[in-house]
């Protein structure tokens, strides 16, 4: 499966990030592969909602937590 990517289900929308808010930070549960069942935080470009399946190229990297402005 590594040549095509790893499917992951969006379980929570964390927030919007990026200069114009064009990127959404989400928590996903990996559905297949070596890290099956693991929940990680990733940045997703484009429209996304809870329950969507996204294909990740790799499952090692995790996005940094969004910091709130003061």
Swiss-Prot record:
Give the record's keywords alphabetically. Answer: Ribonucleoprotein, Ribosomal protein
Where does the chain cross the membrane? Answer: none
Q: Does the keyword Ribonucleoprotein apply?
A: yes
Family the entry assigns: Belongs to the eukaryotic ribosomal protein eS28 family.
Tell me the subunit arrangement. Answer: Part of the 30S ribosomal subunit.
Q: Which NCBIfam families match?
A: PRK04007.1
Q: What is this protein called?
A: Small ribosomal subunit protein eS28
Biological source species: Thermococcus kodakarensis (strain ATCC BAA-918 / JCM 12380 / KOD1)
Which gene produces this protein?
rps28e
């Amino acid at each position: 499966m590594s040549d095509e990517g790893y499917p992951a289900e969006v379980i929570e929308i964390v927030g919007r990030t990026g200069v114009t808010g064009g990127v959404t930070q989400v928590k996903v549960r990996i559905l297949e592969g070596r890290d099956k069942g693991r929940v990680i935080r990733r940045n997703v470009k484009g429209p996304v909602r809870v329950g969507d399946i996204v294909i990740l190229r790799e499952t090692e990297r995790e996005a940094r937590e969004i910091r709130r402005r003061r």
